[in-house]
Design a protein with these regions (language model features):
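Residue at a conserved register position within TPR or TPR-like alpha-solenoid repeats
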Residues: 26-27, 64, 101
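Short solvent-exposed coil/turn linkers within tandem alpha-helical repeat scaffolds
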Residues: 46-52, 82-89, 118-128
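Acidic, proline-/serine-/threonine-rich low-complexity intrinsically disordered segments
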Residues: 1-29, 34-35
Length: 136
């Protein structure tokens, strides 16, 4: 069931780039993670066809991972990895899926994600992080 929007979330302005930027600013400038999560949720619901969707899912995954909600984080990173194959956020999302699997104690699954990043995106920072995470 969809959760009702909290009053903390700014209403959608009708401009996807403005709404996305406001949500990102809540994270980067204001460090207000409690408000950023509903802001990204609102963005995803308001602009289902936006080119900024993968970024919004990635940010939500990152915020939820930081709060220790690995299940929710995993869902957002999987969305980026599976639905947005051309997104520049995809290698990082796959890497984060590996990090979550490792934290869940599934080293084999973690290494599969890490190897996927290294193989598909060899010259990225995500690949370097994956290499380190595998102990290489």
């Amino acid at each position: 069931a969809p959760t009702p929007a909290t009053p903390a979330a700014a209403p959608a302005s009708g401009s996807e780039s403005n709404d996305y930027e406001s949500a990102v600013n809540l994270v980067i400038k204001e460090k207000n993670y409690a408000k950023a999560i509903p802001a990204f949720d609102t963005f995803i619901a308001s602009y289902p066809n936006s080119a900024l969707q993968p970024g919004a899912h990635y940010w939500l995954g990152q915020l939820q991972l930081n709060q220790g909600d690995r299940e929710q984080a995993k869902a957002h990173f999987l969305t980026v990895a599976q639905k947005y194959k051309d997104s520049p956020k995809r290698p990082e999302a796959i890497y984060k899926l590996g990090v979550i699997a490792k934290a869940d104690g599934d080293k084999e699954k973690a290494n599969k994600f890490f190897q996927l990043v290294i193989k598909q995106y060899p010259n990225t920072s995500a690949a370097q992080l994956a290499q380190k995470a595998m102990g290489g």
